[in-house]
Amino acid sequence: MESIEQRVKKIVAEQLGVNEAEIKNESSFLDDLGADSLDMVELVMALEDEFETEIPDEEAEKITTVQQAVDYINSHGKQ
């Protein structure tokens, strides 16, 4: 079974149209991976679906890197 980190990276790659190999834990969605605000909304929705959790807007705004997404899912999502 894939780790949460692997699953998050796969979703990021699909949502942002980037190569999964280019995605690092410290990658910023906006600065490094070229996401815009609409991409971020879609990314959060995809993470919510994958991990069966709800990410409130105020929390979603704090998630700016791959590692922050992984950390959030680890503490709030269903494995």
From Swiss-Prot:
The keyword Cytoplasm applies. It is found in: Cytoplasm. Keywords: Cytoplasm, Fatty acid biosynthesis, Fatty acid metabolism, Lipid biosynthesis, Lipid metabolism, Phosphopantetheine, Phosphoprotein. PROSITE patterns: CARRIER (PS50075), PHOSPHOPANTETHEINE (PS00012). GO terms for biological process: lipid A biosynthetic process. InterPro entries: ACP, ACP-like_sf, PP-bd_ACP, Ppantetheine_attach_site. Its main location: cytoplasm. 4'-phosphopantetheine is transferred from CoA to a specific serine of apo-ACP by AcpS. This modification is essential for activity because fatty acids are bound in thioester linkage to the sulfhydryl of the prosthetic group. Residues 2-77 form the Carrier domain. Pathway: Lipid metabolism; fatty acid biosynthesis. One of its GO terms (molecular function) is acyl carrier activity. GO terms for cellular component: cytosol; membrane. The modification O-(pantetheine 4'-phosphoryl)serine is found at residue 37. Carrier of the growing fatty acid chain in fatty acid biosynthesis. Belongs to the acyl carrier protein (ACP) family. This is Acyl carrier protein. It comes from Bordetella petrii (strain ATCC BAA-461 / DSM 12804 / CCUG 43448). The lineage of its organism: Bacteria, Pseudomonadati, Pseudomonadota, Betaproteobacteria, Burkholderiales.
